[in-house]
């Protein structure tokens, strides 16, 4: 029965596991905050990359590398990874710049502005590490 759901359970567990790893990296950097596990986008390793890479790997093994299911999961992975490295990362850069401008601008002192999130998206290294984790977990899950 677990095999029926393994294509979704294992990638989800991989994403949760990489979120836990991310907390470990945050702790090493002296930036440990348990909220980052659920409300943060970004950091090492990428749980989004791990999830979609694990899913695509498992679908490839289960349905075949030339199947339509694998093609769909691969396109989903590419879109997700491109979004994480490109668009969402740029949002974080903009948030950081806007927060600094508001803090430094004299006129901003008379008005309260919300602090924008700065931890969005991933660096290419974070995506590669997360994706490698996902691929390895997917291979191990299919081999075992």
Please give the residue ranges for each predicted region.
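Membrane-embedded catalytic cores of phosphoryl/pyrophosphoryl-handling enzymes
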Residues: 16-20, 33-144
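Hydrophobic residues in alpha-helical segments
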Residues: 27-28, 60
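Helix-loop-helix hairpins and the membrane-proximal interhelical loops
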Residues: 1-20, 28-31
């Amino acid at each position: 029965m677990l095999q029926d759901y393994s294509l979704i359970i294992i990638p989800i567990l991989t994403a949760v596991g990489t979120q836990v790893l991310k907390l470990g990296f945050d702790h090493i950097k002296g930036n440990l905050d348990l909220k980052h596990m659920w409300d943060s986008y970004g950091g090492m390793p990428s749980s989004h990359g791990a999830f979609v890479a694990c899913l695509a790997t498992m679908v490839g093994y289960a349905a075949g590398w030339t199947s339509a299911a694998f093609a769909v999961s691969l396109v989903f992975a590419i879109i997700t990874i491109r979004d994480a490295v490109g668009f969402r990362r740029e949002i974080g850069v903009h948030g950081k710049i806007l927060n600094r401008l508001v803090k430094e601008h004299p006129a901003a002192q008379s008005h309260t502005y919300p602090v924008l999130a700065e931890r969005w998206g991933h660096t290419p290294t974070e995506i590669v590490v997360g994706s490698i984790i996902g691929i390895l977990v997917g291979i191990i899950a299919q081999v075992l």
